Amino acid sequence: MAEETAEKPVVESFQLDHTKVKAPYVRYIDTETGPHGDVISNYDLRLTQPNEQAIPTGGLHTIEHTIAVLLRERIPGYIDCSPFGCRTGFHLLTWGTHSTEDVAKALKESLEFIAYKATWDDVPATTEKSCGNYRDHSLFTAKEWAKLILEEGISSDPFERKVV
C-alpha cells in the first residue's frame, strides 16, 4: 500500500468533545470567507444530548422541512439548515454572522410554532414530487420532540446553560 503524505482534512465536528456539551444549545462553529470577501457562518443547532437521545427520522425530517421556512423568516442571510446524521440536531449556514443568542431565539420561536401551532398544512414539500423521502414524515413526532426540547430550554452556549 502506498504511503500517504498529504494531511487529512480536519472535520471540526469530529473534534468536538460530545461528552462535554449540554443540549439543547446553539454553538457557533466557524466563519469562512470566500475569494470575493463573502462570509458564511456555520452553527451547530443541537436539539438532543449526543449519545443519549436521537430524534426518530420521521420527526426530524418534518422539523427539517418546517424550520427551512421558519428560520428563513427569522434569520437574515439564511442559506441552509441540514440535519446531522446522528439525528441530534442541525447545521445552520448563513451569510454573515449572527449571535448565538439571536439564532437560539429564532430556533425557539420556530420550535414553539411546531410544538403548539403547526398543522400538516404548515409542513412544506411533503409530496413525492417535492421530497426525496416523502413517506418518512411525522408531525406528531416533530411536535412531541419540539415540546421536549422547549422544556429543556435552548442555550446560547454549548457548555454552560444560558437559556434564551
UniProtKB/Swiss-Prot annotation:
Binds 1 Fe cation per subunit. GO terms for molecular function: iron ion binding; S-ribosylhomocysteine lyase activity. The keyword Transmembrane does not apply. Its EC number is 4.4.1.21. Pfam families: LuxS. It catalyses: S-(5-deoxy-D-ribos-5-yl)-L-homocysteine = (S)-4,5-dihydroxypentane-2,3-dione + L-homocysteine. GO terms for biological process: quorum sensing. Its cofactor is Fe cation. Fe cation binds at H61, H65, C131. InterPro entries: LuxS_sf (IPR037005), Metalloenz_LuxS/M16 (IPR011249), S-ribosylhomocysteinase (IPR003815). The keyword Methyltransferase does not apply. Keywords: Autoinducer synthesis, Iron, Lyase, Metal-binding, Quorum sensing. Involved in the synthesis of autoinducer 2 (AI-2) which is secreted by bacteria and is used to communicate both the cell density and the metabolic potential of the environment. The regulation of gene expression in response to changes in cell density is called quorum sensing. Catalyzes the transformation of S-ribosylhomocysteine (RHC) to homocysteine (HC) and 4,5-dihydroxy-2,3-pentadione (DPD). Belongs to the LuxS family. Homodimer. This is S-ribosylhomocysteine lyase. It comes from Bifidobacterium longum (strain NCC 2705).
